């Protein structure tokens, strides 16, 4: 059988079974479209992640410390290692810019008629998250230095906020826009799971106007990590150390490795 005969037989088979052939062709088209959609979504997510990592800045070192200790009654008595790590890093200022816990919590944020629990999550065509409830972070007074953030209004978290368990917070530009509109948020009080927190500052937006890939990163609230005593939701096991440059990062890693031994 030559190629021409094989082609004729295949053609007669297709013509004789038009319905099945149409479904087969449709399935092929659907399969191709699905693959193209998946590839497009994956490429969009990859680009979004790269922009988000870039927005957080370079030379970040992740330090993980795990400690689970319980008393006879089952109460968690694990040691808080951050004060020791914080003090240790103060002696490494030649190499280290800052250090902070890297923790989050889930809570309902309310200001006026705005309520995070009723906010809907929305995505654009590139699957960038463009709206939704704010992400709630815990940090030290050096959180902004570790995450490439600058204060646009008010002030940053202070060391005394941590030490005195002050119920204050700094919010991102997108959170300020969604909850406060044109009103200056600095000095205003938000309720977080029923607890009053005063907004002391607003971080500058990290993305350009209209750039949805990092927009949701600015939909955030940062609390002193000691606020976890009233808000809960955090066992701090990960910490971020921000080095001055790549060479300093290697040196800092060596020193911190010695601290952890």
Predicted regions and their residues:
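N-terminal Sec/SRP start-transfer signal
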Residues: 1-32
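Short beta-strand boundary microenvironments
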Residues: 92-179, 199, 220
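Short aromatic/hydrophobic contact patches that present stacked aromatics
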Residues: 29, 62, 238-240
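ATP/adenylate-binding site constellation spanning eukaryotic-like Ser/Thr protein kinases
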Residues: 16, 58, 173
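Juxtamembrane alpha-helical signal-transduction segment immediately C-terminal to a transmembrane helix
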Residues: 24, 28, 37-41, 49-52
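Mid-to-C-terminal secondary-structure elements
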Residues: 142-157, 167-261
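Membrane-proximal extracellular/periplasmic loop immediately following the first transmembrane helix
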Residues: 43, 47-123, 130, 235
